[in-house]
Structures are given as structure tokens and as C-alpha cells.
Regions:
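Surface-exposed extracytoplasmic segments
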Residues: 1-215
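Positively charged, low-complexity/disordered segments
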Residues: 216-220
Length: 220
């Protein structure tokens, strides 16, 4: 699922790049068919409307990043993983992940079972992976795997073959989990980002399907 440049005028939710979703991935772990990987990419390192880079801080500590998983085909979440970040000494960040199952998975909040806390966030090339039981976690900067000829698209589909994203970065939230967590037949996955407003969580970003309208709709 690609969700780049989804805000008004190709901007970011609340003007904060750390809240901006770029891609959602879900796939079987290579070499281990009993495990799956879900990944949410946020915080592009670039702006489409400016040559200025975005902030070096990977994630917004005041935000809630959620994976919603529907396991019975009714488009309502039956399982949720919520991720929050906090500052830790020396300018570092850590992550806490909560697992929520059942009726409350469709809601919003900071409830649920904590399955990992104070997991390190990668600021550089080194991939800091945290393992807890059957779960694996990664949080931090990576090269943006998406590819697209942005300049060709904006030039009336006169494509150049150049990948605009080849030197761009994003911040990844990656969870490796056993297939027993997921449905055997019907499975739906989407993500969203929320921030607090007067003690209430407010959704500022959501995605689960490719965002094709900005590429194919001539009115954009």
C-alpha cells in the first residue's frame, strides 16, 4: 500500500512529517513460512513542495501509531498493535508496543498487553532489532523502498525513468509475528496515526489501500 504525499497540497498531517504515512507492507517472512512481517513506514525525509529536509527525529513521542487487523472479514479490527515512542537519554528514542485483542481492538487508547517496552530506535545504519518470545521488532530510519518517477508524473505523465525515491529515507515500524496471530483465510490490515487533543486521541492519518487518485486523476 502506497500512501505518499496524502496531506492537503501534498503536505503532512498537522504539518508534521513524523505523522505522515508512506507505505504499509504485509508478507510472509522469507525462509520461514510460519512467520509474517507487517511494516508501517512513516516520516519521509523529503518534502514535495520544498527542497528542505524534514526533522531528524524519527517518530513523534506524542503520537500513537496503530496496526489494525481484521481476521473475520467484517472490516472491523479484531487485533491491534499500538506503538508509542518516548525520549531516552542522549537524544535517543525508545518504543513501547501494546497488543489488543477482541472487541476493544477496534477502539483507540493506551490499553492492552505490553509486549515490548523501551525497545531502542535506530537513528543510523545499524538495525537495532528487539526479540521478545515469538515476536521481533524494529523501529528507525531506513532507505525508502518505494519507487516512482515523481517528476514525470507532475509533467503530464512524461516519464523519465528516474526513481525519485532512490536517495530518500523513511522511518519504519516493523513487527515480526507468528501466523497464529493472523486469520487462516480472510485477512485485512490497515494503519493509522493519532495524536491527543484535550485528552482525546484524534486520528490524523489512515491508510490501507493504494492511493492512486493523485496519480490518475487529471484534476490533481
Amino acid at each position: 500500500m502506497s500512501h505518499h504525499a496524502s496531506g492537503p497540497n501534498f503536505g503532512f498531517p498537522h504539518g508534521d512529517a513524523r505523522l505522515d504515512m508512506t507505505d504499509l507492507y504485509a508478507f510472509t517472512k522469507p525462509g520461514d513460512s510460519a512467520m509474517s512481517i507487517i511494516a508501517l513506514n512513516v516520516h519521509p525525509s523529503f518534502r514535495l513542495d520544498s527542497s528542505e529536509p524534514t526533522t531528524k527525529e524519527p517518530f513523534a513521542p506524542g503520537a500513537l501509531y496503530e496496526f489494525k487487523i481484521d481476521t473475520d472479514g467484517d472490516a472491523v479490527a479484531d487485533l491491534s498493535y499500538s506503538v508509542q515512542f518516548a525520549w531516552w537519554g542522549d537524544g535517543k528514542q525508545t518504543a513501547t508496543v501494546r497488543r489488543i485483542q477482541g472487541e476493544t481492538a477496534a477502539g483507540v487508547g493506551e490499553a492492552g498487553e505490553v509486549i515490548v517496552e523501551e525497545a531502542p530506535v535506530s537513528f543510523g545504519r545499524e538495525a537495532l532489532v528487539t526479540k521478545v518470545g515469538d515476536f521481533g521488532f524494529f523501529f528507525g530510519w531506513r532507505s525508502d523502498p518505494f519507487f516512482f518517477d515523481v517528476n514525470g508524473n507532475f509533467n503530464h505523465m512524461q516519464f523519465t525513468g528516474d526513481d525519485f525515491f532512490k536517495d530518500k529515507n523513511i522511518c519504519s515500524i516493523v513487527i515480526e509475528l507468528p501466523n497464529s496471530e493472523l486469520a487462516a483465510n480472510s485477512l485485512g490490515i490497515w494503519c493509522r496515526v493519532l495524536v491527543k487533543d484535550r485528552e482525546r486521541w484524534i486520528q490524523v492519518e489512515r491508510g490501507g489501500r493504494d492511493r492512486k487518485s493523485t496519480r490518475l486523476n487529471s484534476s490533481h
